[in-house]
Regions:
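Long, solvent-exposed, polar/charged low-complexity segments
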Residues: 1-5, 31-34, 41, 141-215
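A short, surface-exposed loop/turn module that caps and links secondary-structure elements
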Residues: 43-70, 74, 139-152
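Active-site acidic/histidine clusters and adjacent loop/turn architecture
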Residues: 4-57
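Inter-helical turn/loop segments and adjacent helix faces that build the functional surface
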Residues: 10-17, 108-115, 182
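A contiguous pocket-lining binding segment that forms or flanks enzyme active sites
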Residues: 101-151
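Aromatic- and glycine-enriched beta-alpha-beta binding-site module
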Residues: 60-123
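Residues forming anionic-ligand binding surfaces in small-molecule and nucleic-acid pockets
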Residues: 15, 97, 173
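Amphipathic alpha-helical coiled-coil segments
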Residues: 22, 26, 30, 114-117, ...
Protein backbone atom coordinates (compact mmCIF):
# COMPACT_ATOMS: atom_id res chain seq x y z
CA UNK A 1 0.00 0.00 0.00
CA UNK A 2 2.88 2.38 0.70
CA UNK A 3 4.19 2.09 -2.86
CA UNK A 4 0.74 2.75 -4.33
CA UNK A 5 0.46 5.81 -2.11
CA UNK A 6 3.88 7.02 -3.19
CA UNK A 7 3.00 6.59 -6.85
CA UNK A 8 -0.07 8.78 -6.36
CA UNK A 9 1.59 11.30 -4.00
CA UNK A 10 5.17 11.54 -5.17
CA UNK A 11 6.31 14.58 -3.21
CA UNK A 12 8.49 15.23 -0.19
CA UNK A 13 5.77 16.12 2.30
CA UNK A 14 3.84 12.90 1.76
CA UNK A 15 6.98 10.78 1.89
CA UNK A 16 8.19 12.31 5.16
CA UNK A 17 4.76 11.79 6.72
CA UNK A 18 4.88 8.10 5.76
CA UNK A 19 8.60 7.44 6.07
CA UNK A 20 8.20 5.04 8.99
CA UNK A 21 5.84 2.93 6.86
CA UNK A 22 8.50 2.82 4.15
CA UNK A 23 11.22 1.75 6.57
CA UNK A 24 9.03 -0.84 8.32
CA UNK A 25 7.10 -2.41 5.44
CA UNK A 26 9.28 -1.89 2.35
CA UNK A 27 12.91 -0.95 2.94
CA UNK A 28 13.59 -3.12 5.99
CA UNK A 29 11.98 -6.32 4.62
CA UNK A 30 13.66 -5.81 1.23
CA UNK A 31 17.08 -5.53 2.86
CA UNK A 32 16.42 -8.58 5.01
CA UNK A 33 15.35 -10.57 1.94
CA UNK A 34 18.53 -9.44 0.16
CA UNK A 35 20.64 -10.51 3.14
CA UNK A 36 19.03 -13.96 3.36
CA UNK A 37 19.24 -14.64 -0.38
CA UNK A 38 22.85 -13.44 -0.56
CA UNK A 39 23.77 -15.85 2.23
CA UNK A 40 22.01 -18.77 0.51
CA UNK A 41 23.43 -18.04 -2.96
CA UNK A 42 26.93 -17.63 -1.50
CA UNK A 43 26.59 -20.99 0.24
CA UNK A 44 25.41 -22.67 -2.97
CA UNK A 45 27.70 -20.86 -5.44
CA UNK A 46 30.74 -19.47 -3.60
CA UNK A 47 32.68 -19.33 -6.87
CA UNK A 48 30.37 -16.59 -8.18
CA UNK A 49 31.63 -14.06 -5.61
CA UNK A 50 28.20 -12.44 -5.28
CA UNK A 51 27.72 -9.15 -3.45
CA UNK A 52 24.29 -7.60 -2.89
CA UNK A 53 23.26 -4.03 -3.62
CA UNK A 54 19.91 -2.52 -2.58
CA UNK A 55 18.59 0.45 -4.54
CA UNK A 56 17.75 3.79 -2.95
CA UNK A 57 14.19 5.12 -3.00
CA UNK A 58 15.45 8.59 -3.98
CA UNK A 59 15.72 9.44 -7.66
CA UNK A 60 18.85 11.14 -8.96
CA UNK A 61 18.01 14.85 -8.88
CA UNK A 62 19.80 15.27 -12.22
CA UNK A 63 17.42 12.80 -13.91
CA UNK A 64 13.96 13.66 -12.64
CA UNK A 65 12.62 14.65 -16.10
CA UNK A 66 9.42 16.02 -14.56
CA UNK A 67 8.87 13.01 -12.32
CA UNK A 68 8.64 13.07 -8.53
CA UNK A 69 11.74 12.81 -6.33
CA UNK A 70 11.07 9.20 -5.30
CA UNK A 71 10.98 5.87 -7.10
CA UNK A 72 7.79 3.85 -6.73
CA UNK A 73 9.76 0.61 -6.79
CA UNK A 74 12.70 -0.91 -4.96
CA UNK A 75 15.15 -3.57 -6.12
CA UNK A 76 18.27 -5.41 -5.15
CA UNK A 77 20.85 -7.32 -7.15
CA UNK A 78 23.50 -9.95 -6.51
CA UNK A 79 26.56 -9.85 -8.75
CA UNK A 80 30.30 -10.11 -8.78
CA UNK A 81 31.79 -6.62 -8.17
CA UNK A 82 32.94 -4.95 -11.38
CA UNK A 83 34.04 -1.52 -12.53
CA UNK A 84 30.92 -1.21 -14.68
CA UNK A 85 28.06 -3.00 -12.91
CA UNK A 86 25.68 -3.23 -15.84
CA UNK A 87 28.22 -5.13 -17.91
CA UNK A 88 28.13 -8.24 -15.70
CA UNK A 89 25.21 -10.64 -15.14
CA UNK A 90 23.27 -10.30 -11.91
CA UNK A 91 20.45 -11.98 -10.04
CA UNK A 92 17.72 -9.48 -9.19
CA UNK A 93 14.51 -8.93 -7.25
CA UNK A 94 12.24 -5.91 -7.66
CA UNK A 95 9.06 -4.85 -5.87
CA UNK A 96 6.59 -2.33 -7.34
CA UNK A 97 3.02 -1.35 -6.38
CA UNK A 98 1.33 -3.96 -8.57
CA UNK A 99 3.94 -6.72 -8.83
CA UNK A 100 7.25 -8.17 -7.84
CA UNK A 101 9.81 -9.59 -10.26
CA UNK A 102 12.90 -11.73 -10.04
CA UNK A 103 15.38 -13.34 -12.39
CA UNK A 104 18.82 -12.85 -13.91
CA UNK A 105 20.02 -10.34 -16.45
CA UNK A 106 22.77 -8.25 -17.98
CA UNK A 107 21.45 -4.75 -18.75
CA UNK A 108 24.43 -2.94 -20.19
CA UNK A 109 26.89 -5.45 -21.63
CA UNK A 110 29.60 -4.11 -23.89
CA UNK A 111 29.32 -4.84 -27.63
CA UNK A 112 32.50 -6.90 -27.23
CA UNK A 113 30.90 -9.09 -24.56
CA UNK A 114 27.89 -9.80 -26.75
CA UNK A 115 30.20 -10.52 -29.70
CA UNK A 116 32.07 -13.04 -27.52
CA UNK A 117 28.77 -14.68 -26.57
CA UNK A 118 27.82 -15.00 -30.24
CA UNK A 119 31.23 -16.51 -30.94
CA UNK A 120 30.59 -19.04 -28.15
CA UNK A 121 27.28 -19.98 -29.74
CA UNK A 122 29.02 -20.39 -33.10
CA UNK A 123 31.78 -22.57 -31.62
CA UNK A 124 29.58 -24.76 -29.45
CA UNK A 125 25.89 -24.38 -30.26
CA UNK A 126 25.09 -27.60 -28.39
CA UNK A 127 26.29 -26.11 -25.09
CA UNK A 128 24.30 -22.92 -25.66
CA UNK A 129 21.17 -24.85 -26.62
CA UNK A 130 21.48 -26.99 -23.49
CA UNK A 131 21.56 -23.87 -21.29
CA UNK A 132 18.60 -22.31 -23.09
CA UNK A 133 16.59 -25.53 -22.81
CA UNK A 134 17.32 -25.77 -19.09
CA UNK A 135 15.71 -22.37 -18.61
CA UNK A 136 12.86 -22.93 -21.08
CA UNK A 137 11.96 -26.32 -19.61
CA UNK A 138 10.72 -24.73 -16.39
CA UNK A 139 8.58 -22.20 -18.23
CA UNK A 140 9.13 -19.77 -15.38
CA UNK A 141 11.13 -16.99 -17.02
CA UNK A 142 10.65 -14.87 -20.11
CA UNK A 143 13.61 -13.61 -22.13
CA UNK A 144 13.43 -9.82 -22.33
CA UNK A 145 15.70 -7.14 -23.68
CA UNK A 146 16.53 -4.97 -26.65
CA UNK A 147 17.49 -6.67 -29.91
CA UNK A 148 19.75 -5.37 -32.64
CA UNK A 149 17.85 -3.60 -35.41
CA UNK A 150 19.92 -5.55 -37.91
CA UNK A 151 20.19 -9.22 -36.92
CA UNK A 152 23.72 -10.49 -36.38
CA UNK A 153 22.91 -13.93 -37.76
CA UNK A 154 20.56 -16.88 -37.61
CA UNK A 155 21.79 -19.79 -35.48
CA UNK A 156 18.35 -21.42 -35.47
CA UNK A 157 15.05 -20.67 -33.71
CA UNK A 158 16.19 -21.72 -30.23
CA UNK A 159 19.27 -19.48 -30.07
CA UNK A 160 18.07 -16.68 -32.37
CA UNK A 161 16.69 -14.39 -29.60
CA UNK A 162 19.92 -14.73 -27.60
CA UNK A 163 22.18 -14.36 -30.60
CA UNK A 164 20.55 -11.10 -31.64
CA UNK A 165 20.15 -9.48 -28.22
CA UNK A 166 21.86 -6.20 -27.40
CA UNK A 167 21.02 -6.81 -23.72
CA UNK A 168 18.93 -9.43 -21.95
CA UNK A 169 17.16 -10.51 -18.81
CA UNK A 170 15.31 -13.64 -17.76
CA UNK A 171 12.40 -12.31 -15.75
CA UNK A 172 9.33 -13.57 -13.93
CA UNK A 173 6.56 -11.22 -12.79
CA UNK A 174 4.13 -12.04 -9.98
CA UNK A 175 1.21 -10.06 -8.61
CA UNK A 176 1.39 -8.92 -5.02
CA UNK A 177 -1.47 -11.10 -3.78
CA UNK A 178 0.70 -14.08 -2.91
CA UNK A 179 3.41 -14.58 -0.29
CA UNK A 180 5.19 -11.33 0.32
CA UNK A 181 8.38 -10.83 2.35
CA UNK A 182 7.97 -14.26 3.88
CA UNK A 183 10.08 -17.40 4.04
CA UNK A 184 7.91 -18.75 1.22
CA UNK A 185 8.83 -15.80 -1.00
CA UNK A 186 12.53 -16.21 -0.15
CA UNK A 187 12.38 -19.89 -1.10
CA UNK A 188 10.45 -19.18 -4.30
CA UNK A 189 13.02 -16.66 -5.49
CA UNK A 190 15.92 -18.92 -4.49
CA UNK A 191 14.46 -21.90 -6.34
CA UNK A 192 13.92 -19.66 -9.36
CA UNK A 193 17.49 -18.37 -9.33
CA UNK A 194 19.16 -21.79 -9.01
CA UNK A 195 18.57 -22.99 -12.61
CA UNK A 196 19.78 -19.60 -13.89
CA UNK A 197 23.21 -19.98 -12.28
CA UNK A 198 24.73 -21.99 -15.19
CA UNK A 199 23.60 -19.34 -17.68
CA UNK A 200 25.06 -16.61 -15.46
CA UNK A 201 28.41 -18.41 -15.29
CA UNK A 202 28.35 -18.94 -19.06
CA UNK A 203 27.79 -15.24 -19.73
CA UNK A 204 30.41 -14.15 -17.23
CA UNK A 205 33.00 -16.61 -18.53
CA UNK A 206 32.68 -15.16 -22.03
CA UNK A 207 34.45 -12.01 -20.84
CA UNK A 208 37.70 -14.00 -20.68
CA UNK A 209 37.34 -15.34 -24.23
CA UNK A 210 39.58 -13.99 -26.99
CA UNK A 211 38.12 -11.20 -29.08
CA UNK A 212 36.25 -12.61 -32.10
CA UNK A 213 37.13 -11.73 -35.67
CA UNK A 214 33.70 -10.20 -36.24
CA UNK A 215 31.63 -7.95 -33.97
Amino acid sequence: EFLWGLRLNNERGWFLAHKEEFLTYVDGPTRELARELTAEMTRLYPQLGLVSKVSRIYRDARRLYGRGPYKDHLWFSLRRPAEHEGATPCFFFEVAPERYSYGMGCWDPTPLTMAKLRARMDRDPAEAEKLVRQVARRGEFQLEGESYKRPKGDPGPLLYPWYNSRQFSLCRDENCEGPYFTAELRDRVLEGWKPLAPASRWVEAAAADPSPDHM
